[in-house]
């Protein structure tokens, strides 16, 4: 494997996940289902999720949307708000299917749903149903399923389809996930997901309870080309962004920048991990989270320029973010 650049030699290698911009058959999207978790944000979070689903579906020009609800009541609400979607009722803890759902490898008849251990982001939020929702979604989609014996969340990695991924040391080397060395993590990424080159970034965003998921920090937009945020003048993550840029340059990857939302505060006055990098790349549209700050529109414009042939759509995600993530975090694509 290549670390920061060096390919691992390897024996048996898994089929790789396709890059997110490859054609999708469908997408699983988690639908907020537990009033005890979402409290006063539930209704607005439901509406934000439904708007995201509609943008991805694009009137049938996009991809099939499978809204995953944890109970019959939430399923009924999902059908009302998103009548274009298939609603799948399967018990789960919360909506973060990027991390709890399966990663679908390969394409066509050769697809395999690959699952991993999940421990609530290092024991922070261990909720019933999150540990096996991936296997149940794979079964409902009639996809063969395999599960690895180590903890890995989908939001912790981002690949370019050619065998290279970016990730963060803060998450993948965190002892609250696994007791694995860097070399052991790299070997497992090769064996289970076919990734030959791991580019290690340092820390993720401030106050990110996932311990620095890379899908809030750096995203591939083409083979060998990575988008990262450019800090604002008072950006709480300025040092993180500078460090990421330096490591990506050292790895000889092509870097493009998006604006950063800057300093976005929650109701308690604390910095929240708002990021435009948590966009979702659908068949017809790239959906970019918006936070009601000055750089919202500029971020959408940059994303649209990066994906010719797709429209970029900015949608508010304030209430989803109160749960800890945004559009990429609640979705998991199924390649065609």
Feature locations, PLM:
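The feature marks the mature, well-folded catalytic cores of soluble enzymes
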Residues: 5-336
């Amino acid at each position: 494997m290549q670390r920061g650049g060096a390919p691992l030699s390897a024996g048996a290698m898994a089929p790789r996940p396709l890059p997110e911009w490859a054609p999708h058959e469908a997408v699983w999207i988690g639908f907020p289902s537990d009033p005890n978790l979402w409290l006063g944000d539930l209704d607005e979070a439901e509406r934000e999720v439904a708007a995201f689903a509609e943008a991805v579906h694009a009137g049938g020009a996009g991809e099939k949307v499978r809204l995953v609800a944890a109970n019959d009541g939430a399923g009924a609400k999902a059908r009302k708000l998103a009548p274009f979607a298939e609603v799948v009722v399967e018990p789960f803890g919360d909506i973060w299917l990027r991390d709890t759902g399966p990663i679908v490898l390969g394409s066509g008849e050769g697809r395999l749903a690959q699952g991993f251990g999940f421990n609530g982001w290092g024991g922070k939020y261990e909720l019933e149903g999150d540990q096996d929702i991936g296997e149940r979604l794979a079964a409902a989609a009639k996809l063969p399923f395999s599960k690895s014996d180590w903890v890995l969340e989908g939001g912790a990695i981002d690949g370019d389809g050619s065998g290279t991924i970016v990730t963060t040391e803060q998450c993948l080397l965190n002892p609250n996930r696994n007791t694995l060395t860097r070399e052991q993590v790299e070997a497992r990424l090769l064996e289970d997901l076919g990734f030959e080159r791991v580019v290690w970034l340092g820390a993720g965003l401030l106050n990110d309870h996932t311990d620095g998921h890379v899908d809030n920090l750096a995203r591939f937009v083409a083979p060998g080309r990575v988008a990262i945020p450019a800090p604002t003048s008072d950006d709480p993550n300025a040092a993180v962004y500078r460090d990421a840029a330096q490591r990506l340059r050292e790895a000889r990857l092509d870097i493009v920048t998006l604006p950063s939302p800057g300093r976005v505060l929650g109701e308690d006055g604390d910095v929240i991990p708002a990021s435009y990098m948590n966009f979702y790349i659908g068949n017809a549209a790239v959906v970019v989270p918006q936070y009601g700050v000055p750089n919202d529109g500029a971020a959408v414009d940059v994303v649209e320029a990066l994906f010719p042939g797709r429209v970029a759509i900015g949608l508010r995600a304030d209430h989803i973010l109160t749960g800890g993530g945004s559009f990429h975090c609640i979705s998991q694509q199924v390649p065609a």
